[in-house]
């Protein structure tokens, strides 16, 4: 994380003003993307600037860097970063490997086909080379979805959704989110009733408004 913090300040200066779109800064920004991947850090603004520079300078397009940007965007689900990044990549490059595979993985995650996601990822593990913390970041997103969707879930299903975790690995994630399991194999997620917070709506009506209504009704 030390290298990331050092580069962050420098990159922040590069992204100010018109210099943001100077192609001479691409090498620095691309190294910054690689540092994010290695140190499990993230800077969406800088990554979008890289993709914008690729749009303006197609000859400088780097497939590997773009793939890293997309994978980092996936680690920030449920935020819309992945969609933002995808929209800045032209159709021809979207058809290239490994970008095509990453877009497919993103589609599986966004549509909550979690078991299919892990299966597809297992067949393309080379995509994660140089990417630190990707799988656990995805598991955080899946736990977020489970937390707002389920009250109870089968233990075996939860393990599958999180990537075929072992029993001990599953216990770690359950403990992290305060989930408990009973003897029947059911995991208690939360009571939806406890999650519902009523809103008190108060409308302030001044005297002039009331008097005008009363006058019009007479």
UniProtKB/Swiss-Prot annotation:
Q: At which residues is Phosphoserine found? A: 217
Is the keyword Phosphoprotein assigned to this protein?
A: yes
User: Which residues get modified to N-acetylalanine?
Assistant: 2
Residues covered by the PCI domain:
42-204
| InterPro entries in the record | ARM-type_fold, CSN8_PSD8_EIF3K, eIF3k, PCI_dom, Transl_init_fac_sub12_N_euk, WH-like_DNA-bd_sf, WH_DNA-bd_sf
Any GO MF annotation of the entry: RNA binding
Q: Which Pfam families match?
A: CSN8_PSD8_EIF3K
Among PROSITE patterns, the record links this protein to: PCI
Biological process (GO) annotations held by this record are: formation of cytoplasmic translation initiation complex; regulation of translational initiation; translational initiation
Q: Which domain of life is it from?
A: Eukaryota
Which subcellular locations apply to this protein? Nucleus; Cytoplasm
Residues carrying Phosphothreonine: 28
**Lipoprotein among keywords:** no
Major subcellular site = nucleus
One GO cellular component term of this record is: nucleus
Q: Which keywords annotate this record?
A: Acetylation, Cytoplasm, Initiation factor, Nucleus, Phosphoprotein, Protein biosynthesis
Listed under subunit, the entry gives: Component of the eukaryotic translation initiation factor 3 (eIF-3) complex, which is composed of 13 subunits: EIF3A, EIF3B, EIF3C, EIF3D, EIF3E, EIF3F, EIF3G, EIF3H, EIF3I, EIF3J, EIF3K, EIF3L and EIF3M. The eIF-3 complex appears to include 3 stable modules: module A is composed of EIF3A, EIF3B, EIF3G and EIF3I; module B is composed of EIF3F, EIF3H, and EIF3M; and module C is composed of EIF3C, EIF3D, EIF3E, EIF3K and EIF3L. EIF3C of module C binds EIF3B of module A and EIF3H of module B, thereby linking the three modules. EIF3J is a labile subunit that binds to the eIF-3 complex via EIF3B.
- Please give the PANTHER family that the UniProt record associates with this protein: EUKARYOTIC TRANSLATION INITIATION FACTOR 3 SUBUNIT 11, EUKARYOTIC TRANSLATION INITIATION FACTOR 3 SUBUNIT K
Return the similarity comment.
Answer: Belongs to the eIF-3 subunit K family.
| UniProt function note | Component of the eukaryotic translation initiation factor 3 (eIF-3) complex, which is required for several steps in the initiation of protein synthesis. The eIF-3 complex associates with the 40S ribosome and facilitates the recruitment of eIF-1, eIF-1A, eIF-2:GTP:methionyl-tRNAi and eIF-5 to form the 43S pre-initiation complex (43S PIC). The eIF-3 complex stimulates mRNA recruitment to the 43S PIC and scanning of the mRNA for AUG recognition.
Supply the name of the protein: Eukaryotic translation initiation factor 3 subunit K
């Amino acid at each position: 994380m030390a290298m990331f913090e050092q580069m962050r300040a420098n990159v922040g200066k590069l992204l100010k003003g018109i210099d943001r779109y100077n192609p001479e800064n691409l090498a620095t920004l691309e190294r910054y993307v690689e540092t994010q991947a290695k140190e499990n850090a993230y800077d969406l603004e800088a990554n979008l600037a890289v993709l914008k520079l690729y749009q303006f300078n197609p000859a400088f397009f780097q497939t590997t860097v773009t793939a890293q940007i997309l994978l980092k965007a996936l680690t920030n689900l449920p935020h819309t970063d992945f969609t933002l990044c995808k929209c800045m990549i032209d159709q021809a490059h979207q058809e290239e490997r490994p970008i095509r595979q990453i877009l497919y993985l993103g589609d599986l995650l966004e549509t909550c086909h979690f078991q299919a996601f892990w299966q597809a990822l297992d067949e393309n593990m080379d995509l994660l080379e140089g990417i630190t913390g990707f799988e656990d970041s995805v598991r955080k997103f899946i736990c977020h979805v489970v937390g707002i969707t389920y009250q109870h879930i089968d233990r075996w299903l939860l393990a599958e959704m999180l990537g075929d975790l072992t029993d001990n690995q599953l216990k770690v994630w359950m403990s992290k989110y305060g989930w408990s399991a009973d003897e029947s194999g059911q995991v208690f997620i939360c009571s939806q009733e406890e999650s519902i917070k009523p809103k008190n709506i108060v409308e302030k009506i001044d005297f002039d408004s009331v008097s005008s209504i009363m006058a019009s009704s007479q």
